[in-house]
Amino acid sequence: MKKHTENTVKTGLWCLAGGAVIAAILMPFFHFDFDWREPLLSEVNADITVLGFCAALASLLYFLVTAVFAFFYRETPQQQNSELPKCSVIVPAFNEGEYVLTTLRSVMNSNYPSDKLEIIAVNDGSSDDTWDWIQRGANEFPGRIRTLNLLQNGGKRRALYEGFQIASGEIAVTVDSDSAITENAIRALVAPFQRPEVGAVAGNIRVSNCDEGFIPKIMEAAFGFGFEMIRCAQSFIGSVLCTPGALSAYRLSAIRPLLDDWVNQTFMGRPSGIGEDRAITSMIL
């Protein structure tokens, strides 16, 4: 809990500092020179100033409210092994190559009880050697990993759909094939499902190579704000608006009635190729 509080404060300070730096950089490019001898121009400038002030004030209030809610967020205590439900971990993979094995190994290193953990690896019609690496993972952990080979690439939504259909657990956890989870991640994700009204839980996504350059650091700051603050604040009020595709958990009894509509979702008459995480979250809500 102390670590969460520290991360929340750290993320907030970084966001404030970043906003101040950006404002300082942009300030010279904005000049509001009010010439009251030109009524029309002065009215436009005044309107822009008022709108800008209102937008800045609204952003500040949003940030402060989010920070307060996130500060008071508390993680759900984890259960004893005997109380844990059966969990199905679904790993969809497309042209991920060797890294899918890293993902599978990280799942296998979980401290979740092995007799309550089902791993399903789905090859989404990859054109490289991803399927070979999935099979290698299954051979490395005999009887522990179920494999599904889709001959045609149908997209992540279709791969997850097929995994959900054969999952036998009470809870389904989705993990991207370019990610690695910590050993305690599944237990932490499953804990909130002790409350029957919970239909989905968002994982906490971080950048593993944030020390290797400027871009990873920027991504880490964005992820920190998104997960340590925004989603914590949303969880505090009981309504997370998007469970991230890289790591999330779902109550299968809540999503199974929604799956056909979800997998066949269209946008402007065409099949939806992205946004599967936000779509299923909205359906659950």
Task: Locate each region found by the language model.
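N-terminal membrane-anchoring/stem segments of glycan-assembly enzymes
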Residues: 1-83
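Non-transmembrane catalytic domains and loops of membrane-associated enzymes and transporters
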Residues: 81-285
